[in-house]
Amino acid sequence: MTSLYLRENLTFDQARVQVLHEGKDGKDLYMKGICIQGGIKNANQRVYPVQEIAKATKTLNDQISSGYSVLGEVDHPDDLKINLDRVSHMITEMWMDGPNGYGKMKILPTPMGQLVKTMLESGVKLGVSSRGSGNMNEYGSGEVSDFEIITVDVVAQPSAPGAYPCLLYTSPSPRDLSTSRMPSSA
């Protein structure tokens, strides 16, 4: 098996994207929907077994729950590092529902976040795409193993057929208004 940099994309309709608002005037903008699909061959000719997605989704959600900021970008860079000048959103939670990994992403008031917000509010259907690493079967099946999600990026043309999250405008809960925790360094 060969270890690879893996990017997967889902369209707006495929991801069943929702738009949420909360924050300024009680409204911040969120995208919510499918981030990665399991058990099906995607446009990149890869198949992510459901157990691989479940494990990767849990690991990423554990990082978020521990207080780490998981940031995403507009489009995919050619490597796994996060480029702060391209950040558009922060993933606030990830979970599994059936064979799919879902996520909720807060659109940030960065230049790239403003670009995403303007497009979404103008009716552009943006998709999302997971970015991570893993091994791919060398015998042509396209099956991925040892998958680790680094982040989920906003893209124009996702490879996963259901990765078009919806937009949400929601009000902050009292929990959201409390002091945030920073992870301690070891």
Ranges and model annotations:
Residues 169-186:
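Single conserved hydrophobic/aromatic residue that forms the stacking wall/gate
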Residues 50-82:
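Small/polar-rich, solvent-exposed N-terminal microdomains that initiate assembly or binding
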Residues 8, 87-90, 176, 182:
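Positively charged, low-complexity intrinsically disordered regions
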Residues 6, 13, 33, 69-73, ...:
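Residue microenvironments linked to proteolytic maturation
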Residues 51-58, 110-114, 185:
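Generic alpha-helical secondary structure signal
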Residues 1-62:
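Polar/acidic, low-complexity leader/linker segments enriched in S/T/G and N/D
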